[in-house]
């Protein structure tokens, strides 16, 4: 299963999947609610543009978590989660979608890529994040596993998508699940 350790930098707190920390080219983290600028019921690290927060607050929160973890927010690619098992193959053309460019896709609960520098982003409340890294093929995946996705085997579907797209072998993929918050 692997461990998640709490990390903090410049007042921003996140969780890091320790098995991935030493993997070359992998930058990852699971944000917490700590270290952002949002106020009131959205306090403080709100990363949703659809919850009624001011857009500049959400953008600043992304800048803060990006600086803490070590990526550029303009490299983000968002999912569009609707509790499906749909996986999107993310390419260079997707860079910034959801953050600097509008999404031009819907119903995507998993993202896979082999493009260095792209940052995949999925979002969670009480669902489970699934992380996938193929260190041989230099491919990664990230899936949102709610109860529907779990029942319909989104983890297996993500691994199969990586195999189909990048030639990943299941035995080479390092996978971790995050925690559900209920």
Protein language model features and the residues they cover:
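Active-site microenvironment for binding and transforming phosphate-containing groups
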Residues: 1-181
